[in-house]
Curated annotation (Swiss-Prot):
Protein name (Swiss-Prot/TrEMBL): Small ribosomal subunit protein bS16
Family, per entry: Belongs to the bacterial ribosomal protein bS16 family.
Species annotation: Afipia carboxidovorans (strain ATCC 49405 / DSM 1227 / KCTC 32145 / OM5)
GO molecular function, one term: structural constituent of ribosome
Basic and acidic residues bias: start-end ranges: 90-103
NCBIfam families: S16
Length: 110
């Protein structure tokens, strides 16, 4: 059983509110869950304290048990200082192709 910490959508049409839940990864997004850890209201301003509420003790306990946070929940935990999110960069993307490299070298010489 693969356990994940993820967001389950609640609220009404055009007014989403998300519950942060622990669930089996095979369960539907808004379906059965094991435990509710908090909530996230994306409609509130980013500086509002009520935008995100998490029970950090429960979150740490589930992470210790091996629960995998979703990408969005990992961002929340990284901002809270609970877990460190690995950077997702592609260093090869910044390397110029041959034509651009030649043009860049010519521009540097001029």
């Amino acid at each position: 059983m693969s356990v994940v910490i993820r967001l389950a959508r609640a609220g009404t049409k055009k007014r989403p509110v998300y519950h942060v839940v622990v669930a089996d990864s095979r369960f539907p997004r808004d379906g059965r869950f094991i435990e509710r850890l908090g909530y996230f209201n994306p409609l509130l301003p980013k500086d509002n304290e009520a935008r995100l509420k998490l029970d950090m003790d429960k979150v740490k306990a589930w992470l210790a048990k091996g629960a995998q946070p979703s990408d969005r929940v990992m961002r929340f935990l990284d901002a809270a200082g609970v877990a460190k999110r690995a950077p997702r960069n592609n260093p090869e993307k910044a390397v110029p192709r041959k034509e651009r490299k030649a043009a860049a070298e010519a521009a540097a010489k001029a």
